Amino acid sequence: MLPCRSTGRRHALQHQPPQFKAHTGQRSTRSASIHRDRNNPDAHITSLEGQNPRPFGCSPPRSLQQQPAKPPQRGSLLDRDGIENITELWDRLQLLKQTLDHMPMADGLKPLKNFKSLQELLSLGGERLLGELAKQNIRVRQMMNEVAPLLHEDGSCTSLNYHLQPVIGVIYGPTGCGKSQLLRNLLSAQLVTPAPETVFFIVPQVDMIPPSEIKSWEMQICEGNYVPGPEGTIIPQSGTLCPKFVKLSYDDLTLDHNYDVSDPENIFAQAAARGPIAIIMDECMENLGSHKGVSKFFHAFPSKLHDKFPKCTGYTVFVVLHNMNPRRDLAGNIANLKIQSKLHIMSPRMHPTQLNRFINTYTKGLPLAISLLLKDIFNHHAQRCCYDWIIYNTNPEHEALQWSYLHPKDGLMPMYLNIQAHLYKILEHIHRVLNDRERWSRAYHVRKNKYQ
C-alpha cells in the first residue's frame, strides 16, 4: 500500500514580502525599502517620495530648489555719506595743493592735474574714482583718530617721550635763540615723563652760571613736579616735594668714579637710588669735542642704572649744540650722541644749509613735495621773532608725531606729515587718472579720423 501524500494547500512563508513581476521592457532594479533596519538605521536612507529611484538629473516633483547665491548689491556711492567724505577730502586736497603751489621751492615740482571744482569732480569723476576717494577719506579719518588718545583736547601732545626710556635729546640752536629757556620749559611743562627728582646742570665752569638762572631752574623744575588736583589741590608727580638742582662742571662730570655705577662716590648713582634723574649739558660743545670720552652717559649708563636702582624709572639727557655738524670731534662724542639721540630739537634760526642737510637725511621715506614743504616751514618760522622749535623723533609713539612743532603758547603740536604724504599720493592718483583719460581720448579721435 502506497503511503499517503499530503494534498493540502501550501502555506506561505511568514515575513515574506510579496513578489511583483517586473515589466518586460524594464531592467529589474533593487528597490529601496521604505522601512529602516533597526540594527543598521543609516543604511540605504532614501526619500519617502516613492519606491522607484528617479532618473539622474531630474528634480523631484514638488520639491523646492535652492536659488543661486547672489552677490551683495553695492550701494550708491553718491549717497549722503559718500558725498560728505568726498567733500571733506576735496577741502584737504585743495588746501595742500594751494600750499604746494605757492611755495618758493615749488619750481622743481611737476604740476599735478586736478578737477577745477568739487562739482566737476562729482559730475565727471566717475563711479570708480569717487568710490576710491570716499574710501581714502575714511582712511584719513582713521589715521587722525589713531593719534587722538595721545593728544590734549586742544590738539597738543601730552608728552614728548610718552614714558619711553631713556630720553636722549640734542638741541641745535645759535646763540640767543632761547636754548636755556627751552630746557626749563621742557621740564616745567611736564613734557618729559616721568618728572626727574634730581637735575644735574653741567657747564664748562660752575662760576659762569648767573644766580638768576639758578633761581629760574629751581622754580621751574619744582613747578613741573606738580599737577592740579581736585578742589584746588596740587599733586606731586614724583617721590619728592621739591626736586634737587645740582650744579656740576664738565671736569667733575668726567671724573673716574662717575663712570663706575658701583662706585659709592658716583653722584649719579646716589641720585638714581632715590628716583629719576636728568642730565643737562649746556655750552659744552667744545668740551665734547676733546679727547675725553663721555659717550657712556648716552648708551651704557641708562641700562646699568635701571638694573641696579629700581626707583630710577627715568633717565634723561639733553645736550646743547651750536652747530649741527661740528668739525672738531676727537673722541667721537658728538657723532655717538647723534646716533643714540631719540630727539632732535632744532631752532629754525639754524643755518639753512645745515637744516636742509638734516631734512634730506631724515625724510627719505617721504615724497619730494613733502620734504620741500618741511623746508618751507623752517624758512617761514626763521623769519618770525618767536622762540619756537621743530622736533624730530626717531622713535615716536605714533607716526604722526615723528615731526612736531613746539610753540611757546600753543604747546607741542604734531605736524601730521604722514597724513600730508598720504594726501599728496591721492593728488598724484587723480593726476594719473586724468592723464589716462586724455590719452584714451586722443587715441579715440586719432582712430576716428583715420577711418573717416
Curated annotation (Swiss-Prot):
It holds the Pfam family Adeno_IVa2. It is found in: Virion; Host nucleus, Host nucleoplasm; Host nucleus, Host nucleolus. Residues 442-452 are annotated as: DNA-binding. One of its GO terms (molecular function) is ATP binding. Keywords: Activator, ATP-binding, DNA-binding, Host nucleus, Nucleotide-binding, Phosphoprotein, Transcription, Transcription regulation, Viral genome packaging, Viral release from host cell, Virion. ATP binds at residues 173-180. The keyword ATP-binding applies. One of its GO terms (cellular component) is virion component. Induction: Expressed in the intermediate phase of the viral replicative cycle. InterPro entries: Adeno_IVa2 (IPR003389), P-loop_NTPase (IPR027417). One of its GO terms (biological process) is viral release from host cell. Residues 1-78 are annotated as: Disordered. It comes from the Viruses. Belongs to the adenoviridae packaging protein 1 family. Homodimer. Part of a genome packaging complex composed of packaging proteins 1, 2 and 3; this complex specifically binds to the packaging sequence on the left end of viral genomic DNA and performs packaging of the viral genome. Interacts with protein 33K. HAMAP family: ADV_PKG1. Component of the packaging machinery which encapsidates the viral DNA into preformed capsids and transcriptional activator of the viral major late promoter (MLP). Binds, along with packaging proteins 2 and 3, to the specific packaging sequence on the left end of viral genomic DNA and displays ATPase activity thereby providing the power stroke of the packaging machinery. The activity of packaging protein IVa2 is stimulated by protein 33K which acts as a terminase. May be the protein that pumps DNA into the capsid powered by ATP hydrolysis. This is Packaging protein 1.
